[in-house]
Amino acid sequence: IQDVHLIDKMAHFDRERIPERVVHAKGAGAHGYFEVYRCMEEYTCADFLQVPKAKIPVFVRFSTVIGSKGSADTVRDPRGFAVKFYTSEGNYDIVGNDIPVFFIRDSIKFPDVIHSLKPSPDTNLKDVSRFWDFISNSPEAMHMITWLYSDRGTIKSYRHIDGFGVNTYVWVNSRGKRRYVKYHWKTMQGVETIDRHEAEILAGLDPDIAVRDLHEAIECGKYPKYELYVQLMDIEEAENLPFNPLDDTKTWPEDRFPLKRVGMMTLNKNPENFFAEVEQSAFCPANIVRGIEFSDDKMLQGRIFSYSDTQRYRLGINFTQLPINKAKCPVDNNNQDGLMRYDYKKGSVNYKPNSLNGNKPIEAPEERVECVYVEGNITKESIKKTDDFTQAGERYRGLNENEKTALIDNILSELWQVPEKIQRKLIEHFTRCDEEFGDRIAEGLNLKSKKSINKYKFK
């Protein structure tokens, strides 16, 4: 026991691991920059979007969602697409996915959808019946299913995926004009997917293929590029739409709300240390800057708390002081102490208001925000405009025949393992999306009649 070098070495080794992310555990990261195409002052006073050709440092983390850190990159899953902008007024995080919609529209169901996708608590084995049971009782997920179970749900390269903010934010210009905004990243390498069979093979042969592909491409100078587009909507328009634009299970029609190009992101530097820069990177939808606000998007409102809270659990209360998360602009507040605090404020005044320190810190200036009139009783209620099936049906009918067949085959490859009562409920949902869609699922499960099914033998 007197060999203090041994004790110190072993003690450090025993504590090398930190809690794994509950979702998005397996990931890859890269540094780069974002170059603004044109001044966006008409729409937002966000400082980093005002000067054409300005280059803003960024860090990006791509990830799978459900699997643990040792899982395969090619499994059917949404992919996380999180971007941290190190702006002159603080960090701004766009924390999105490679699919424009999500399973649910209310954050209170988020733990439930994740629980249904994770291994069963009694056996720790993945059971697709649990997920499809949840989906059969959550028809708002139909639109997401048409994306996830197409070949967009299986990829082998993060360089060849698009990204979407999913949530709706608010942009505010210097005159106080507020607009809803949705973010779109479009890969300049072209979207590439793989089918289920190749995904299953690669999961065994090269489970880290997407992480490796990104690292090797940057290492040899093939820098991935992604263009940022936004859709903008006057807040007054929301009431006249047949759906709620703050519903994360919906997309905005591009013919009515066209995409506007904002700039281009280039990833040109690999992390020097994976743990320090990728594992300890912390993205939070709550990280916004002047000129950008939160909407009443129910999923966003839940994420504002949850993401910051999970980082405090994983990394400690002072996670924003870690180099990868630290803002590149000056930060001044009265936060103090806590585990692993190393950046500190000099002097004796750590409160406000005060006279001894000139009433500092001074709050960052905000642009004038137009008055928003609110009246009525506060209540807990669901989104009223649901329409769970129209956009899912439009998505299905927009696929070509090969894409439809792949979607059907991918769904059936799991549904044959599901109890018949859940199958029948899902067929009803698919039929409400599109009659052909429902018929093909029913045919694959031999459920045209009420006889006992023959298990679907997928290709």
Regions found by a protein language model. Give the residues of each.
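Active-site-adjacent core segments of small-molecule enzymes
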Residues: 1-459
